[in-house]
Amino acid sequence: MDGILNINKPFGITSFDVVAKVRRIYSQKRVGHGGTLDPYATGVIPVFLGKSTRLIEYLSSVSKTYLAEIELGVETDSYDSEGEITFRKTCDYVTREMIYKTLMDFQGEIIQIPPMYSAVKHRGMRLYNLARQGIEVERIPRVATIYGIELLNYTSPVLRVRIECGHGTYIRSLAFDLGRKLGCGAYLKSLVREAYGQFNLTNSLDFADLEAAKCDGKLAGILLPLETAIGHLPRVSLDEENITRLVNGLEITLDRIDKPEAVAVYNAENSFVAIIQPETDGTWHPAKVFIRQSPKPDAN
């Protein structure tokens, strides 16, 4: 089967566990996910089956929205609730106004240092493997983009914020840095991913939904179409001649179109056909094709 599932990941399992469960339910090997969530985090994780796995790379340009609970006055070695406490300090002096003003410092492009408990590699080793050995190394700072951050509630010592951010943002690091700026320390108490591009919690499925669909023989019916993952890309409708060229792996020329990194191609029947990318000579080549070439009729 080819398609996408918008899964609401429960607490306590890894993103790989989600993929494994989907593989078992669908009896299908070609399954992947579109964005790792830590075991303690819950919420949206798109899961791709069959041909749709070829679209995972295009999710890197979409934003994610998180609901985060941050507790002030405590730091942990993992920056979240799973780690060992390394620092405590009273936060009685912190006001809602102080938090609001400090959060504004995190708008736009910011510099983050990945947590030691992360999948980032250092000399070929995952940081979390080094951290479990009690080894701390210097990490290379990274640029992250925060499109919006909203303070929803503050009842000392816990605040709730909604964050819209770009690819590669560490909410744990944001919580840690917020605590440092406020002078009292902080850690990420809980995290829910509410949205990831076109996918959101409102129309997500849990594993009970998948099991029910399996019992009813409706597993194919709950799959989202491939184009759900690339709704953020520019799109163009092409005639049969150009579609045929793309299906055959040939470049095409387009007039009056901007040149983003990728464009989704549809045919006259509004069916998703391919993703094309620009060449330096002004032509476009097929990066991914999702329909097969129709067999040629006999010459008789």
Curated annotation (Swiss-Prot):
Swiss-Prot/TrEMBL keywords: Isomerase, tRNA processing
EC primary class: isomerase
GO biological process, one term: tRNA pseudouridine synthesis
Keyword hit for Nucleus: no
Catalytic residue positions: D38
Enzyme Commission number(s) from the entry: 5.4.99.25
UniProt key word Isomerase: yes
Catalysis performed (reactions): uridine(55) in tRNA = pseudouridine(55) in tRNA
Single Gene Ontology MF annotation: tRNA pseudouridine(55) synthase activity
Disulfide bonds: none
General function of this protein: Responsible for synthesis of pseudouridine from uracil-55 in the psi GC loop of transfer RNAs.
NCBIfam families per the UniProt record, alphabetical: TruB (TIGR00431)
Similarity field: Belongs to the pseudouridine synthase TruB family. Type 1 subfamily.
Protein's name in the database: tRNA pseudouridine synthase B
Organism: Dehalococcoides mccartyi (strain ATCC BAA-2100 / JCM 16839 / KCTC 5957 / BAV1)
